[in-house]
Amino acid sequence: MRVSQIMSSPVMTLDKDQPLANAIDLMRRNEISRLVALEAGKIVGMITERDIAREMGSSTTYRLPPGRTHVSNVMTPNPITVAPEVIVKRAAEIMLDHDISGLPVVEGEYLAGIVTKLDFAKVCAEYDDIYVGQVMEASPTTVSPRDRVVHARRVLLDEDLVGLPVMEGGKLVGVVTVRDVAMKLAAFQEAVPNQHKSERIKNLLVGDIMSQPATTTRTDARLPEVSRLMLERRFSTLPVLNLEGELVGLLTKTELTQIARERL
């Protein structure tokens, strides 16, 4: 199987000198997690939700909102690229080895598409012999609705996590993802006057931004149906419940990538 068979196309791009606010708006409206940054039509960088979450929570950004920050200040420069004919297994290896979640697909000078970790859901949709409980990340890190967003952001970034289940009284009440943090902090930055930003952002709670109720799966669910759900709903992570309804794990796009690497 080749990258050209699972990649997404066309690719959303923008100039590296555009305001960061434009990148955030494109991601929000198109429900995508990354954009390719260009200079004179050439690929010079990649900007992701994680980059935005990192930038939006920094003390510098309290003084310099998204409308006054450029994409070039936040993007990862010179992203690794692959050709359309590269085998899918190799693309999975590159992402896992380099701890990245997306690769622009380039044919000569032409940007042909992009392949992301979530695209490996298309591969996993064929593995009817795998159950979620066999491949999930067990005992995931969790947060409370009363935890501060700055704490959840720090955990997501420091531990390189996709999402955090939100627990209250031993029950799953929501999920907070890197996207939730990035988009909500960006909106907050734009709406709150400068003199109040630092204090207001520090007091923003997980319960204010989490996705609720959480869409979940179970340990006995087969991987194909869950892979299709993640792809259709653009879910980067799904909490996994046991047969008693207790949270026991997470299934993320990273697990899908690992499965593709191992099975192809």
Locate predicted features.
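Tandem CBS (Bateman) regulatory domains
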Residues: 1-10, 48-78, 92-93, 111, ...
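The conserved cystathionine-beta-synthase
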Residues: 14-31, 38, 81-99, 106, ...
